[in-house]
Amino acid sequence: MSIVTIPARNEKSPFASMKGHHVAVRVPDFAAAKRWYVEKLDFRVVHEWPYADQRLAYLAPAADDSFFIEILGDGQPGPIPKPGYQDLGDSLRLAGFHHFCLNVADMDRTIAELRRRDVAIVTEPFELPVIGRRLAFVADPWGNLIELAQVLA
């Protein structure tokens, strides 16, 4: 159970219809990124389309239809490479987008399977009691960080 208290919803806000939809991830190689997210994380390809000299796709987690990753790949100039992180502390010093988070039911099982699939584990699982979560961080081959979060019992 989460210890984070969510304030009451503001249904009267002019922005009440806003809901999260996707996070865009820029990669240099569209086909390789799509393949990585499908093969390593079991994401499903929802839709693909071209835009100028780039290729884009919405990818959804294996059993979640409410959150997408939008892959933006190819095109010129290519994206500026992200640095390789040795640990989470290194990454927290950079401005801008940091990571996206995926909830998991069993952190140990998830990390074991990611390790079996040769996914880079950036930070081993650790507990953060102040938010009632057990967290870990992994990275795709292009340095995009993915947080994994399990609610502490």
Task: Identify the residue ranges that each predicted region occupies.
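N-terminal beta-strand motif that seeds the catalytic metal site of vicinal oxygen chelate
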Residues: 2-32, 52, 97-104, 150-153
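Active-site beta-strand termini and strand-to-loop segments that position acidic
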Residues: 59-64, 138-141, 151
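Core segments of cupin and vicinal oxygen chelate
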Residues: 15-17, 25-70, 74, 116
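Acetyl-CoA-dependent GNAT
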Residues: 72-77, 150-153
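Vicinal oxygen chelate
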Residues: 2-4, 27-32, 80-145
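Short glycine-/small-residue motifs
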Residues: 68, 145-148
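Conserved catalytic-core motifs of GNAT/GCN5-like acyltransferases
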Residues: 24, 44-51, 123-129, 150-153
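Residues that flank catalytic or metal-binding motifs in active/ligand-binding sites
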Residues: 19, 55, 65-67, 93-98, ...
